[in-house]
């Protein structure tokens, strides 16, 4: 895959505070990003955007790849769920583990998908 790491935001990382364990949060977000890279088109782009307000900090991880069906969107966070075409490379615990870590720390994770892109939304409540 062609990976281009750019920071297009003017948001300074020192401006953001997320409650919880740094290492576990990093693992959860890295897992979601890795998944987005693996399932993006060959020349696709994975975008990471962060919004921060008084109520929550949200991380949006967006990729361009195959659309996730409504059924897939409901099952993607279930332990051991893996698409048949990816079963050789996946144990199906990455996204469920990320979800468990995020929720254990008071956050939420969701996914939205259409023909153009898939977006994982992680919100950490302040």
Regions found by a protein language model. Name each.
Residues 35-37:
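Short helix-loop "hinge" at the ATP-lid/N-box region of the Bergerat-fold HATPase_c
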Residues 13-20:
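Conserved micro-motifs of the catalytic ATP-binding
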Residues 43-55:
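Short beta-strand/loop element within the Bergerat-fold HATPase_c
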Residues 94, 98:
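Short alpha-helical Gxxx[C/S/T] motif in the catalytic ATP-binding
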Residues 68-80:
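Short conserved segment of the HATPase_c
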Residues 25-29:
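A residue-level detector for a conserved hydrophobic packing site
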């Amino acid at each position: 895959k062609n990976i281009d790491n750019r920071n297009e935001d003017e948001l300074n990382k020192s401006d953001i505070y997320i409650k919880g364990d740094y290492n576990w949060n990093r693992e959860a977000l890295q897992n979601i990003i890795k998944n987005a890279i693996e399932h993006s088109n060959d020349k696709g782009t994975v975008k990471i955007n962060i919004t921060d307000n008084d109520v929550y900090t949200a991380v949006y991880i967006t990729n361009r790849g195959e659309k996730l069906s409504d059924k897939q969107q409901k099952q993607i966070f279930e332990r051991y769920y893996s698409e048949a075409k990816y079963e050789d490379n996946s144990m199906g615990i990455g996204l469920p583990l990320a979800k468990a870590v995020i929720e254990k720390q008071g956050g939420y994770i969701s996914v939205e998908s259409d023909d153009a892109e898939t977006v994982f939304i992680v919100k950490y409540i302040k």
